[in-house]
């Protein structure tokens, strides 16, 4: 939901590792999701560059010992789970105790990381859930310490589920076979008519000249033939107009939807099937990016004075979450696509 609208409405706001909040002017207490330190950057300097105030830098410094290697920089070390999650939860608890923002977002990626690396259901994921339970308890104790436990709505959400993978396929290899991609003798990309970009268990196909009717028709025919054969990881090809009707728009011309066990690679060099790679979320042992009705569904749980007890929704649309939260705060969201989940509210 709109942090800017909450600022206008007069609420104080906080965000810890919530995606795309870097230097967000409407966040009063901000510790941004910090992935990629620049060369020569210090830990505190990096967070400051992403919008953390001096007050937040003190909290970061206090909890720095929880980071891998005490916060020595480097993407792999800094974003190592669950250490980074211990750090960010501790920071969030300190913000709650010291500043009590009226609206706060906290994001950890421990379960997401475990599923990418090991699959959807396994002992590693169960251990990750135990840690999530621990962190929720820490946040609740921080609310209790601040005196706001019983007047706070606590909501647990997820942006997606995941499905297990059996393989990772490279559609661009077959584009090259069809003459849609040209490579030199060393396998370097020389030119292209159509190019497939991975979104994990879906993929966007771009045309170099989207207005070229012949290129469009040739690419569509190649994709439909591949889908009909059923061996290339997808059995459905959506046009841009079809995906736009479902809420997905962009500069692409087509979208490929997974067969349910295949992820897609952007690479154009053989072999056409690539090995799993735990360092890239698209190619781990489980991932996301598919149509939302597939697979285990993302989480939504809520407790607090604004919510009715023992209410169960069989399903809901993720776009309904922000309007529901806005309704709790009395913040208008006139441009929102979703609706308020009234059944949940007192």
Descriptions of predicted regions:
Residues 13-17, 103-107, 154-156, 204-206, ...:
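Structural recognition of the beta-strand scaffold that forms the well-ordered cores
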Residues 19-23, 110-113, 162-163, 212, ...:
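Short, solvent-exposed loop/turn segments at secondary-structure junctions
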């Amino acid at each position: 939901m709109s942090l800017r609208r909450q600022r206008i409405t007069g609420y104080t706001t906080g965000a810890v590792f919530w995606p795309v909040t870097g230097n967000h002017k409407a966040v009063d207490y901000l510790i941004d999701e910090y992935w990629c330190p620049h060369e020569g950057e210090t830990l505190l300097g990096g967070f400051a560059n992403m919008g953390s105030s001096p007050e937040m830098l003190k909290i970061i410094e206090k909890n720095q010992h929880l980071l891998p290697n005490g916060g020595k920089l480097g993407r792999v070390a800094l974003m190592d789970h669950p250490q980074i999650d211990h750090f960010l939860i501790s920071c969030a608890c300190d913000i709650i105790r010291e500043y009590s923002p009226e609206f706060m977002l906290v994001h950890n990626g421990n379960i997401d990381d475990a599923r990418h690396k090991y699959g959807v259901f396994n002992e590693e994921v169960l251990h990750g859930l135990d840690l999530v339970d621990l962190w929720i308890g820490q946040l609740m104790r921080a609310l209790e310490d601040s005196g706001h436990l019983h007047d706070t709505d606590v909501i647990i959400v997820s942006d997606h589920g995941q499905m297990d993978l059996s393989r990772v396929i490279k559609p661009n290899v077959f584009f090259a076979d069809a003459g849609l991609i040209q490579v030199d003798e060393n396998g370097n990309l020389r030119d292209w008519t159509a190019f497939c970009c991975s979104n994990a268990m879906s993929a966007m196909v771009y045309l170099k000249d989207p207005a070229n009717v012949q290129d469009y028709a040739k690419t569509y025919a190649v994709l439909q033939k591949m889908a009909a054969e059923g061996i290339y990881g997808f059995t459905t090809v959506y046009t841009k107009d079809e995906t736009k009707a479902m809420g997905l728009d962009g500069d692409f011309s087509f979208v490929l939807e997974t067969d349910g066990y295949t992820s897609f690679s952007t690479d154009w060099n053989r072999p056409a099937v690539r090995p799993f790679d735990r360092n890239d979320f698209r190619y781990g042992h489980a991932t996301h990016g598919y149509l939302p009705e597939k697979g285990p569904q993302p989480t939504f749980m809520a407790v607090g004075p604004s919510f009715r007890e023992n209410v169960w929704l069989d399903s809901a649309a993720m776009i309904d979450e922000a309007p529901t939260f806005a309704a709790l705060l009395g913040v208008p969201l006139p441009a929102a696509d979703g609706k308020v989940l009234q059944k949940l509210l007192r």
